[in-house]
């Protein structure tokens, strides 16, 4: 298999189709669009252009392997919820560096996790999509990242 070569390119020199592909991916990751068709329509991009570039263009932060990412969760207060969340993070190969959980109010709690992604076996967006599938997770987002 041929080794992939990557280049760091400033956004303003990317073709419109690549920039819009990144916008579509962001809409889908953040659940701001219900489907690929909905997302491409919102940014005025053809579906064929999206599928052409979706596996070839990435935001820079997704390519940096050794970094710390802080995730924010809004969870239903359920027994074992945090344990399941932490297990999913561990299964991804991430290392939990810190955990902060608020006292549950009105059946909801906020959790902030800082994780090291240096040994992560999948990209952060795949992990976030897995975490969103838990029925007790109401919200998950990246608060920040750094090396």
UniProtKB/Swiss-Prot annotation:
Which Pfam families is this protein grouped with? ACT
Superkingdom per UniProt: Bacteria
The record's section on InterPro entries has: ACT-like_dom_sf, ACT_dom, UPF0735_ACT_dom-cont
Q: Which residues form the ACT domain?
A: 70-145
Task: Report the CDD domains cross-referenced here.
Answer: ACT_PheB-BS (cd04888)
Q: Where does the secretion signal sit in this chain?
A: none
Similarity-based family:
Belongs to the UPF0735 family.
Q: What is this protein called?
A: UPF0735 ACT domain-containing protein YszB
């Amino acid at each position: 298999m041929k080794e992939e070569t990557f280049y760091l390119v400033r956004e303003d020199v990317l073709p419109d189709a690549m920039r819009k592909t990144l916008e579509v991916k962001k809409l889908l990751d953040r659940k701001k669009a219900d489907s690929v068709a909905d997302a491409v329509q919102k940014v005025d991009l053809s579906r064929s252009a999206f599928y052409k570039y979706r596996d070839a263009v990435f935001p820079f932060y997704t390519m940096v392997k050794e970094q710390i990412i802080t995730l924010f969760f809004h969870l239903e207060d359920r027994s074992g919820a945090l344990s399941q969340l932490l297990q999913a993070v561990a299964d991804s190969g991430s290392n939990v560096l810190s955990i902060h959980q608020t006292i549950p109010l009105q059946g909801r709690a906020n959790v902030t996790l800082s994780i090291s992604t240096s040994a992560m076996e999948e990209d952060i967006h795949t992990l976030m999509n897995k975490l969103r599938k838990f029925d007790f997770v109401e919200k998950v987002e990246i608060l920040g990242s750094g090396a």
